[in-house]
């Protein structure tokens, strides 16, 4: 796995904001790792039951994603150009390009990269990913 951060960083308005964004980027990386490992328990700590994922194949709610997790193989992934911003103190939005190789239900993932956007919110003392959307990069 390779992770390359964008040289153009968003301009946080404080060190605290920058630190929070860095922490949330690490959580996003953990989501990818737990999905690759098919670790449902760790995944549901990061992605709650009311989360929505919008994939090229359609809209998937977290319970459905977990139920089909073993049908999905992420053999390799790469995250590039991560950018984040905080529109308010309890929300972080990340955008980046992802390349993922693998298959679901016997069909290979589309081979082109996607632009990913994930909205993280703070619930109590924890950050959770509540919305993820992938958009194909045309080419």
Segments and roles (model prediction):
Residues 2-139:
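A beta-strand edge to alpha-helix "cap/lid" segment located at domain peripheries
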């Amino acid at each position: 796995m390779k992770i390359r951060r964008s040289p153009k960083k968003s301009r946080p308005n404080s060190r605290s904001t920058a630190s929070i964004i860095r922490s949330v980027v690490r959580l996003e990386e953990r989501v990818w790792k737990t999905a690759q490992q098919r670790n449902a328990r760790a995944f549901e700590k990061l992605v709650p039951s009311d989360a929505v994922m919008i994939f090229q194949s359609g809209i998937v709610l977290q319970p459905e994603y977990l139920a089909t997790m073993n049908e999905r193989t992420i053999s390799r992934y790469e995250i590039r150009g991560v950018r984040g911003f905080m529109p308010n103190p309890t929300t972080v939005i990340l955008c980046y390009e992802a390349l993922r190789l693998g298959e679901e239900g016997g069909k290979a993932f589309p081979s082109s990269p996607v632009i990913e956007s994930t909205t993280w919110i703070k619930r109590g003392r924890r950050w959770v990913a509540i919305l993820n959307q992938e958009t194909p990069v045309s080419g």
